[in-house]
């Protein structure tokens, strides 16, 4: 990344898009506190990430990575309950309220049916839903997700995006996520940040960012673009005219 400057306001639903290697995962890891900003500054509510208590910051911001692996044989229910750890004192266990919150998060993500199975025994798509359930149980102000629909079939892609939309609308939760599917990005996100070679190429409403010339330049491919009545787009690459 270079020459990046952006801000996210409370309650926004922001999609970060761009081709492979454009910097999507890097910028989300910065926002999630996984990477250091290096010579730059990264602020939450005007305070540098480095100057904030990590446990308190975890109550406000949750990070959902693209890939998940566990060295220990945790059950699905235990993974979701980990979302409550920022609220627990040292050497204390989850209480009834924590268990209820985790149960509700599993219901919302349809993961309750395999709550007692081992996390490493379930499919990649199921793991993604479990990790998102844990993020919901964390009850953050901001949720940062790196391609949360990448391992899901279309049914669960729509389900997860609808869940995030509901959290955004009902709780005013700020959502920032990387996406590859430009159709879904245009349908669910209210703001899109289009990256190209580590820089912000376009930033604005989906109908402003997802212009034919912008997509062709950044993705280096000629396309046919159809804009639906709801503002979402359908893209048909002309494979015979790849630039």
List the predicted regions and their residue ranges.
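Helix-to-loop junction immediately C-terminal to a conserved catalytic motif
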Residues: 32
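Conserved ABC transporter NBD signature motif
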Residues: 40-48, 57
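Conserved ABC ATPase "signature" region
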Residues: 81, 96-114
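Conserved ABC ATPase signature
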Residues: 92, 118-122, 126
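Catalytic Walker B motif of ABC-type/P-loop ATPase nucleotide-binding domains
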Residues: 143-147
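ABC ATPase nucleotide-binding domains
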Residues: 218-243
